Regions:
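Alpha-helical scaffold domains
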Residues: 1-135
Length: 135
């Protein structure tokens, strides 16, 4: 699947009731939110496969679910320290942090080496990254 196809698919799967439910759990990102459930994102990964360049585009999309999807299709061994920093600095909800750590950063030697550094940061979601990686 190409980037534009993925975005169209996410828009098609939009679920406003899920967005309301997410808000009740404190998921109120500044990015656009479609309310696509994680199991639907996992189904999409089967068609996309691993694609690091696409993953970076998805992280940069400004769409909540696309960013989570990016964490699922990225290749941990190709992550640079600069890419990790760029991703971490854009975190705006706990679920994106947790999913990115579980799906991607946990498999990255570079990200794991930054745990102590992340734990000393002031920004809530940057600090959470450290604790999600330790869990």
């Amino acid at each position: 699947m190409e980037y534009q196809e993925i975005i169209k698919k996410l828009e098609f799967l939009k679920n406003p009731k899920n967005v309301e439910g997410m808000a009740r759990f404190g998921i109120r990102p500044k990015t656009k939110v479609f309310g696509v459930p994680i199991p639907e994102l996992r189904k999409m990964v089967k068609f996309i496969g691993k694609n690091h360049e696409l993953a970076i585009k998805l992280f940069d999309s400004g769409i909540h679910e696309a960013r989570i999807l990016g964490s699922m299709v990225a290749e941990a061994e190709k992550l640079s320290e600069n890419q990790i920093e760029n991703i971490v600095k854009t975190f705006d909800s706990w679920d994106v942090v947790d999913q990115t750590c579980m799906n991607l950063f946990d498999k990255s030697v570079i990200a794991k080496k930054k745990i102590l550094e992340f734990s000393k940061r002031e920004a809530e979601f940057e600090k959470r990254t450290a604790f999600a990686l330790m869990a």
